[in-house]
Amino acid sequence: MATQFPPPSKRQKREATAKSSEQADLTSTIPDGSIRIRFVDQTTGSSDTLPVLTVPLAQATTTNLNILLNELKDQSDDRLPYRFYHSSATQALGDKEDVYHALVRPGRVSSEEEVVLQYAPQAVFRVKAVSRCAAAVSGHGDNILAVQFSPKNSSRMASGSGDKTVRIWDCDTGTPAHTMKGHTGWVLAVSYSPDSSLLASGGYDREVRIWDPETGKQVGRPLKGHTNFITSLCWEPYHLQKPGRPRLASSSKDGTVRVWDVIGGKMDFSLSGHKGNVTCVKWGGTGRIYTSSHDKTIKVWDSTTETLVYTLSGHAHWVNHLALSTDFVLRTSYHDHTGKVPASAEEKLAKAKSRFEKAATINGEIVERLATASEDCTIILWKPLTSPSPITRMTGHQKQINYVTFSPDGTLLASAAWDNHVKLWSAQDGKFLFTLRAHVGPVYVACFSADSRLLASASKDTTLKVWDMRTGKMKEDLPGHKDQVFALDWSPDGVRVGSGGMDKQVRIWRN
């Protein structure tokens, strides 16, 4: 008897219909005619001196538009890949799309009118989405609360745990490299120095400890002074450091931020003024220190004069997290996607400074944007170098926001919240782009890939998810953890993702 297959389900029919209509769209003939296109820089809103071009509809593909734009900007010999948006960052043209099928045929524009296409440069390298667990390593005896990759490459990752230890993992072999003991309470924060030569840790015992990540040995004495637990750590940007004297900022529930001379083993200065728990500290590339607090404010300090510059007010509840548009380049200093390390100290300093200035310069000015995430379910975008007034307030989350982060190229902003969602925003003006829906529990943390094309998120639902930033769709679902995932990091070289949580296992993910 011949095998009989069951009839297709409604879902299969729907998918088949969608696929056939998609194929029909792609094969439909592009009519004769042309369209006028104006290119506008998405970052500055300026069209520079670029002329309006009349382009045949049949030739108006993203590939050809890339070639045209590079020629107009005299970059033919050293082409940059660009992404194009129509009217707002919500309508990105796909890498293989054309203006006719993306805009004219759906009725978004008429071929008779001038079409404004915003452009944003993309990374010249491409990161692949992690899709499998390469290693699940046991060792910690309690919840894993923090993980961070070395800025140098993805071969080493540090983790901090409720078992009072800091561990460094060899991600190439999936084995532990060092176990650092000394803390007498939960380790809540770990942070590599920008040149990857030192590792800082802090937590419930109110002490900051500095470690040599190559040997696993402690450097100097514990840094003592805080009267309550430490909430976050941030190193002074490499290009601002005095040679051989790196400094570290630590924030605490005691309401203060302390700046430490880690080699001298002493406090440099203390910043007090908050009336509640200081939840996060960031050290900007111009020397400003940014702090958020449960007193509903953000304070901006000058690290040179050790004084308060601004108090930023606007949130109606605790401020849980901060992010700077330059976080990625400050974290990685002179390390970039090429893997080439400058030979001399002067060259390292120059490269770190030029990477920061390139990332922060808009219209010839250094612009460092700040995003603040609050318990009041909103995010506020600021330009704190020039004004204490907010650029915009972003609303949409239904519950408190845990985490906020900028993409490495500074064009996108992602927020993770207790409403089970990650939301994506334009980092220029705060416009809402996408809601990333798939998690079924609160999302604790999110991080971008080095090329800004992908985002990973970790949740109470025990999973990691990887998202495509162009479409806002989920690219990979990564189950494996047996309990909540608290900590997540994507290596600066884009090769690996590290995660940890309540199941006490460090997991290393890769393509």
Cite the ranges covered by each PLM segment.
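Intrinsically disordered, low-complexity acidic/Ser/Thr/Pro-rich linker and tail segments
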Residues: 2-46, 54-145, 154-155, 327-368
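A structural motif specific to WD40 beta-propellers
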Residues: 132-135, 175-178, 217-221, 266-269, ...
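WD40/WD-repeat beta-propeller blade N-cap
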Residues: 137-144, 181-187, 223-230, 272-278, ...
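WD40-repeat beta-propellers
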Residues: 147, 166-169, 190, 202, ...
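Loop/turn segments within WD40 beta-propeller blades
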Residues: 148-154, 173, 190-197, 215, ...
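Conserved strand-to-loop turn within each blade of WD40 beta-propeller repeats
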Residues: 159-163, 201-205, 213, 250-254, ...
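A conserved positional marker within WD40/Gbeta-like beta-propeller blades
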Residues: 165, 207, 227, 256, ...
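C-terminal interaction modules of eukaryotic adaptor/scaffold proteins
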Residues: 425-431, 439, 449-450, 456-511
